[in-house]
Design a protein with these regions (language model features):
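Extracytoplasmic/peripheral linker and loop segments enriched in polar/acidic and small residues
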Residues: 353-354, 404-419, 444-515
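Ligand-site clamp/hinge motif
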Residues: 218-270, 402
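Surface-exposed binding/hinge segments that line
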Residues: 95, 129-203
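N-terminal lobe/hinge region of extracytoplasmic solute-binding protein
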Residues: 37-87, 118, 190
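Structural transition elements
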Residues: 195, 329-366, 380-387
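Long beta-strand-rich cores associated with HINT superfamily self-processing modules
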Residues: 513-534
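Ligand/substrate-recognition segments at binding pockets and active sites
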Residues: 206, 244-247, 263-265, 329, ...
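Periplasmic-binding protein-like
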Residues: 270, 296, 300-340, 387-388, ...
């Protein structure tokens, strides 16, 4: 019997020989270039306008942050030389490291930092919370500025240094003054990070290139997550966009590329047999799959219809579609990342119990589903989203819903999901994505559990749940971790009722890279500093 897995593996093996025949770079030049197959096509460059990880990952090479989280989730100085905090906890004074410069040669100033924080805070989940307690920003001089708060906010430095989208990247003031709801121009991708973006070589759908900034001065501390010294060991970082998994596997086997960010689980056995390839899991919190509803338009503006669909969804189906039959590569998940202090099983029988399709059909009818079209926008160029979308599409058909399956690429999904129009005017009803486990570890950075509707900084889908917002606010001022965990239990119960999204499970995808590539850092995403190649 020819299974999907066998067919893909055979296809990858068949394409190895042609890949080997292509000309190779000279050894010296090859050592200075890191060639990566990223998880998606890079179509959007503004990491404040979008939460897309592909944009965030590239942005970390270009822009830097005032603080960076280490592997213990502690904020460490990055662009900041240090900070002071007043005794009442309401005045932060941040001092920049001397000599920081943007890639255009201009110095990094306090004015750049203040403008960047303001733009970021308009879009980011925890940034929005910080903005509500900020009294004023005050520039003292080019290297020092103050953040004066109305009340203490213990997560201030965490917010400025977290790697979760949206990241508080520091941009030149003129760029940071861009409307938060508009994208910056490609020519304004200018940061102070270890690499410069090569706009003239950017070919969406094929190639994105960054080159080492010779003027960048890394911190002295060892690199740890997104903190410490960001040492650029390559003259060029090349992202090769290869949507076809078999072709990507063949390129890795032949040495045409050095690193494949999200190898297809069906091809793990093939890759493991190659002694020149290493598969290694670098993200201990894994990833969380989700199905996102558009709650502005029928049919999923109706919570009963959302609940009817969720009652038929089986996390095992989604996880096996992503990682195959190896049960060690996935776990059932609720609304907070399994294994973290805020996670619990409260209410999760609604997601884990037996699935009854006939009961779900009856629930849809009782909820008033009138055969409205359901537009599922599916990114087929990313296996993680494609697999989930296929499971949902089959489920919708079995439930008798009027499915319009729009197979497209991730770049198009990123653009289309921003539309608030009804489906007849180019809108959408459903899409799948995933979040790094870190991003769902607590309410602070958890953008998809927000219930702020179409308010400032709301995320695509625009669910409205006043109770979720009340509980989130309470979490920030809770007196202890135990009290916070209790709040998260209630948040999970409310989320199961209101369903801002449906979690499809927690999964673990290793990086696949050539054995001569070393120094890849553990973290919630691929980090391109500290890496070397022999």
């Amino acid at each position: 019997m020819i299974t999907r897995r066998n067919a893909l593996a055979a296809g990858a093996a068949a394409t190895v020989a042609p890949a080997l025949a292509r000309p190779a770079l000279a050894q010296g030049a090859a050592r200075n270039v890191l060639r990566v197959v990223p998880h998606a096509n890079l179509t959007v460059l503004d990491p404040i306008w979008t939460t897309a990880y592909i944009t965030r990952n590239g942005a970390f090479m270009v822009w830097d942050t005032l603080f960076g989280l280490d592997s213990q989730f502690r904020p460490q100085p990055q662009m900041a030389e240090g900070h002071t905090l007043s005794q009442d906890g309401k005045l932060y004074t941040i001092t920049l490291r001397p000599g920081l410069r943007f890639h255009d040669g201009e110095p990094v100033r306090s004015q750049d930092c203040v403008a960047s924080i303001k733009r970021w805070a308009a879009r980011d989940a925890i940034g929005q919370k910080l903005a509500t307690v900020v009294d004023e920003y005050r520039v003292l001089d080019d290297r020092r500025f103050e953040i004066r708060l109305k009340e203490p906010f213990a997560l201030t430095l965490f917010a400025l240094g977290k790697p979760a989208s949206n990241v508080c990247f520091i941009m030149p003031e003129r760029v940071a003054n861009t409307d938060p709801n508009a994208q910056i121009k490609p020519e304004d991708v200018i940061g102070s990070g270890p690499f410069r973006f090569k706009r003239d070589e950017w070919n969406p759908g094929a190639l994105a290139v960054w080159t080492r900034d010779p003027a960048y001065q890394p911190r002295a501390e060892p690199a740890d997550w997104v903190s410490g010294g960001k040492r650029a060991n390559f003259e060029r970082i090349e992202w090769r966009i290869i949507p076809d998994a078999a072709t990507a596997a063949a390129a890795l086997q032949s040495g045409e590329v050095d690193w494949w960010e999200t190898p297809l689980a069906d091809l793990f056995p093939l890759l493991k047999r190659d002694r020149n390839i290493v598969l290694e899991q670098m993200n201990p919190l894994g990833e969380i799959g989700i199905l996102r509803f558009n709650q502005l338009h029928p049919p999923f503006d109706n919570p009963e219809i959302r609940r009817a669909l969720a009652s038929a969804m089986n996390q095992a189906d989604y996880m096996q579609a992503i990682v195959g039959d190896d049960s060690s590569l996935w776990k059932n998940a609720g609304f907070f990342t399994p294994g973290t202090p805020m996670a619990s099983d409260v209410g999760l029988d609604a997601l884990k119990g037996p699935r009854d399709l006939e009961a779900a059909k009856r629930a849809l009818a009782a909820a008033g589903y009138k055969n409205e079209k359901v537009v599922l926008i599916a990114a087929t160029d990313i296996p993680l989203t494609h697999a989930q979308s296929q499971v949902t599409a089959e489920l919708l058909r079995r439930l008798g819903m009027n499915l319009d399956y729009v197979a497209t690429d991730w770049g198009t999904v990123v653009q289309r999901r921003a539309s608030r129009e009804p489906v007849e005017r180019g809108g959408w009803n459903l899409f799948h994505t995933w979040w790094a486990g870190f991003d769902h570890a607590n309410p602070a950075a958890h953008l998809s559990i927000r219930g702020n509707g179409t308010g400032p900084g709301s995320w695509f889908g625009w669910p409205t749940s006043p109770r979720l917002e009340e509980l989130r606010d309470a979490w920030f001022i809770a007196p202890s971790e135990a009290a916070q965990a209790k709040i998260c239990e209630e948040m999970q119960v409310v989320a199961l009722r209101d369903l801002p999204y449906v979690p499809t499970g927690q999964f673990f995808i290793p990086f696949a890279f050539r054995r001569n590539v070393t120094g890849i850092l553990k973290g919630p995403m691929p980090l391109f500093w500290n890496v070397t190649k022999s």
